[in-house]
Amino acid sequence: MGRLGDILNNYAKQNPVRFHMPGNKGKINFNISTDVTELFFTDNLYNPDADTGIIHELEDKIVKCFFPNANHIHSIISCGGATLCIQAAILSLLRFKNNLSDCGQEKYLICDRASHISLINTLALLNITPLWIYSDDFIEFIEDYSKIYGNEILGVFVTSPNYYGRIKDIKAISEVCRKYSLTLVADNSHGSHLAFYSSGELHPINAGADISVDSVHKTLPALTGAAVLHTNKKFDKELLLRSSMRVFASTSPSFLILQSIEAMIEYLTAHGYDGHKVLLENINQFRNEAEKIGFAFDYFSTEPYRIVLSAKLSESSDNINSGKFLYDYLCDKNIFCEFYDSDSVILIPSILNTKNDFDVLLDALRQFASKYKFYSQPSVKVTEANISTNSVVSINLSQALKLPRKKILTDNAINKISAEAVSFYPPGIPIILPGELIDENNINYIKQIREYIDVIDM
């Protein structure tokens, strides 16, 4: 076995408490002998056979599992993660809007600026101009953009929930989208499990979105790369979406991922609602006990399962990252979380996390509290806060990706045009985009990420 295999096997052997993706928590196994290519009896994921019915049957089960009381919903499987779903959704909007008379005209997409890098790359590939929304006031922005750009707008793209568990008012956004006949796409990558919360009202499809991108591997028991694209009756374009997916997808989808989705649906059909109810009880009990010993949680997080744990060290200075300090401490206790920022640690639990996992976590936090001085400070920091709202776009996204580039020291990049998107990953929200002018307001942030940066060679 090579080095990577050794590292991963050693991690698995130490039986870690996993509060990171994927949602399977290392508890599902598949025989590699079932990893095959498309054969006459396996069906073809991106061009399924209506007669064989294997893929369609599985997708129908997904609909019934996620939306048992809904009608006219299609679910399309992706083995290329949420990125492939986003690519397919945006290309479908473009194809749906385009016709021979206006296909050469500029097209726009109203977008949440705190969108994942996969959306940025998709816009660049398809030469679509983003109309950014920088605040939570989506309604006003959609109204204003619609009045200015009219029929040239392809639709609206929102991220909900985000990495920090902050959910947007999809119902209100969908209502204004209907007013202007705009298709609403929700990047629900971090909220697939919300279909099993209460009556499912927090899932974007149930809240009014036309298309939802569910990266099921993040919070549900499936293999990494498993995702599902849901669409409702307003954008009832299953064949168009599937055709668009074929443009970007590998012609060799993973049948191991497909099997994991099938196993996930079987598990969720039996345990989805009850299991998530128990998980929420464990999370709420953990929150209550952690608060008693001085820890705080992000009060902006409205996603009931996401844990944003804050502990600002009393002796903290500019040279001490409180979030990293707590993250590293938990790693030493064999507890591995998703990521950290300057003040917080983000944990992603799933239905496969046990009560014992939370007990072990709480015990570690009690030890931390007895050893270090810190004060409660609910996290208000988000990566999006570093995004400039007045960035100068010198070259559009599509052109910026195609032009010659050179690598220079970040210190020397002021007033240069970025040739790449720069972001911490996770959460993958770019602080600066290809084609934007690098200024002093974001240079210090960029220096935290990388010493060198690609700029347009002009």
Label each region the model flagged.
Residues 1-53, 182, 427:
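N-terminal "arm"/small-domain region of PLP-dependent enzymes with the aminotransferase-like
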Residues 2, 49-56, 83, 206, ...:
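Electropositive phosphate-/nucleotide-binding environments in soluble metabolic enzymes
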Residues 4-9, 57, 65, 72-75, ...:
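Conserved PLP-enzyme active-site core in the AAT-like
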Residues 26, 163, 218-219, 234-236, ...:
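Short, glycine-/Ser/Thr-/acidic-enriched flexible segments
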Residues 36-45, 64, 125-126, 130-132, ...:
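Gly-rich Lys/Arg/Thr-decorated short loops/hinges at beta-loop-alpha junctions or inter-strand turns
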Residues 45-50, 64, 77-78:
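Asp/Glu-centered strand-loop micro-motifs enriched in Gly/Pro and often flanked by an aromatic residue
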Residues 291-437, 445-451:
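Conserved C-terminal alpha-helix-loop-beta "cap" of PLP-dependent enzymes
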Residues 453-458:
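Charge-dense polyanion-binding interfaces
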